[in-house]
Amino acid sequence: MAHQCACFHFFLCGFICYLVHSALAANSSSTLCFWFPLAHGNTSFELTINYTICMPCLTSQAARQRLEPGRNMWCRIGHDRCEERDHDELLMSIPSGYDNLKLEGYYAWLAFLSFSYAAQFHPELFGIGNVSRVFVDKRHQFICAEHGGLNSTLSTEHNISALYAVYYHHQIDGGNWFHLEWLRPLFSSWLVLNISWFLRRSPVSPVSRRIYQILRPTRPRLPVSWSFRTSIVPGLTRPQQRKVKFPPESRPNAVKPSVFPNTSR
């Protein structure tokens, strides 16, 4: 009897452990993070974008119909005309997680919005899938995306910019160019922010100081004030005359004016 109870408890504990392990495995997720310096703020909102998913109409019938009310010069691939309902909405939620009321700089906003869009709608760009949420680690200034895959297919041997370029041009050929225009600011703003962060914290070298001194604008010259006494230097306003040497005993005395001319006006 005791042996049966021990076996029952053993199988019961094993079953409970299996359920817990399955639940943890189902909820397990990996995190992909990007470091964006100078990213602070406290806001959460949703961004909705209306965009057409139609290609330009190329047929003569569509060219005539585009002038009619309710028609458009853009039509779906394989169709000869475009209706008013031939559009789509892109709904993107902007995550919260900031403690200030602003993002410091336009590039921080641009990078934040671009990464949020790319992680939610094009996670394959980063070698991930099934992105559950995008959040911010304000302590380390990380913008992260939680995804369901345990391993990322993004090879560490390749540059993310090169992978982006290949993926971008491949998607352009596939007809998704209107989606991926949002991905350009991600890498440009990321580069600008990191370069700015590096330049702010790097010591000033003598070369940079010299360039600054050369390129520093000069002060504008102030108007000359004539309210002080001036003396006329002989020889500046009169033509130069030949010098005559006098003997020491016959040297003429220089006459000094007793009163200087008033030039305060």
Swiss-Prot record:
GO terms for cellular component: extracellular region; host cell endoplasmic reticulum membrane; host cell Golgi membrane; membrane; viral envelope; virion membrane. InterPro entries: Arteri_GP3. It is found in: Virion membrane; Host endoplasmic reticulum membrane; Host Golgi apparatus membrane; Secreted. The keyword DNA damage does not apply. Pfam families: Arteri_env (PF01606). Minor envelope protein. Belongs to the arteriviridae GP3 protein family. This is Glycoprotein 3. The gene is GP3.
